[in-house]
């Protein structure tokens, strides 16, 4: 029997990859948040979109510096995903709090999270007001991944990428 869903209808579109979204302020100070709302939207030009709460520090930084990185972790970084998802970077260095190491990206100023297995570096193409969120469309400047987990352009079963089901539920891609 089908039942109408009136709250959290977006959960029908889950699971989504849980990832780190990195940004930086104008001085280059790093920030990281946990996110699951992202999708490719165009191959030519290569565009992705991430949706971020308007009041978040990350949204403020992306609007200022116009760059961000999608960092795809494995389950080894699950604790750090939770820390970065429960804390604002406005007053706390989340890299330090989550015990993450940031390393230089190839084409943008925001750092990439060491230990992730995939990275998508983006320059802001367009920001769209989308209810309580901004939808940040990013032009992909560079995308790369760990070849131990990618074969023929696809993730291998051993990647163990966290998938967010909604709420506090996470499963792993296998």
Please give the residue ranges for each predicted region.
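Basic, polyanion-binding surface patches
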Residues: 1-174
């Amino acid at each position: 029997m089908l039942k109408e869903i009136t709250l959290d209808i977006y959960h029908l579109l889950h699971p989504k990859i849980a990832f780190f979204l990195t940004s930086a302020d104008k001085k280059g100070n790093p920030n990281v948040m946990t996110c699951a709302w992202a999708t490719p939207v165009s191959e030519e030009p290569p565009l992705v979109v991430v949706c971020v709460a308007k009041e978040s520090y990350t949204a403020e930084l992306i609007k200022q510096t116009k760059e961000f990185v999608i960092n795809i972790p494995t389950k080894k970084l699950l604790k750090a995903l939770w820390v970065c998802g429960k804390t604002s970077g406005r007053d706390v260095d989340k890299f330090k709090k989550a015990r993450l190491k940031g390393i230089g990206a190839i084409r943008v100023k925001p750092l990439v999270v060491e230990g992730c297995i995939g990275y998508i570096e983006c320059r802001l193409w367009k920001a769209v007001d989308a209810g309580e969120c901004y939808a940040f469309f990013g032009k992909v400047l560079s995308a790369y991944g760990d070849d131990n987990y990618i074969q023929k352009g696809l993730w291998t079963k051993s990647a163990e990428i966290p998938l967010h089901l909604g709420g506090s539920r996470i499963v792993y891609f296998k």
